[in-house]
Design a protein with these regions (language model features):
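Alpha-helical transmembrane segments and their immediate juxtamembrane cytosolic regions
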Residues: 1-175
Length: 175
């Protein structure tokens, strides 16, 4: 995947997230905004997985995500009235799990993957596992898609947020 395609994916992710958040704040009963917004997270997760894959200084990359998470947490809490960790904490967690897996430290990765179920952060285990799936994307595209399908079904069973299944359409941007 070339640089221009990665930038296009980042732009689509940001735009669909903006639409989702506009809907959440200003039009909470308009489901269309939320439906469009379902495309954003998998694209961000893909970007994190690609970042882990290509960065030469993982801990600097990880630190930037974590610092942004800490600095944006008060705004997130104020704007959305939510006390759980914002999605950037989950992105950092997922990046760490994937990094340790790629470094051959499978036990550490497993602890992070399992531990994500108990963490109080936006997208939680679903988000961490989504990043992990996308980390395997390069070599196993169909496995990633079916892994995402399974994650979405499990997420739907746990949260009743079946709208998240629409996130599978994000794969259309990754070809």
């Amino acid at each position: 995947m070339g640089r221009e395609q990665r930038q296009f994916i980042q732009m689509i992710a940001a735009l669909t997230m903006l639409i989702d958040h506009i809907g959440m704040v200003f039009f909470p009963s308009a489901i269309g905004f939320r439906a469009i917004g379902r495309l954003s997270f998998p694209l961000f997760a893909f970007g994190i997985a690609e970042g882990v894959r290509y960065t030469h200084r993982f801990w600097r990359y990880f630190g930037r995500i974590l610092l942004t998470a800490v600095l944006s947490q008060p705004i997130y809490m104020l704007l959305f009235g939510i006390t759980q960790g914002n999605p950037l904490f989950m992105l950092a967690w997922g990046a760490a799990a994937l990094y340790f897996f790629r470094q051959g430290k499978r036990a550490v990765a497993a602890v992070l993957l399992i531990g994500s179920y108990f963490a109080d952060m936006s997208y939680g285990w679903y988000g961490v596992w989504t990043i992990f799936c996308f980390g395997l994307y390069v070599e196993r595209e169909s496995l990633c898609f079916y892994g995402q399908l399974l994650l979405n079904i499990l997420y739907g069973l746990k949260t009743r947020a079946w709208i998240q299944l629409l996130s599978l359409f994000s794969f259309g941007f990754l070809d």
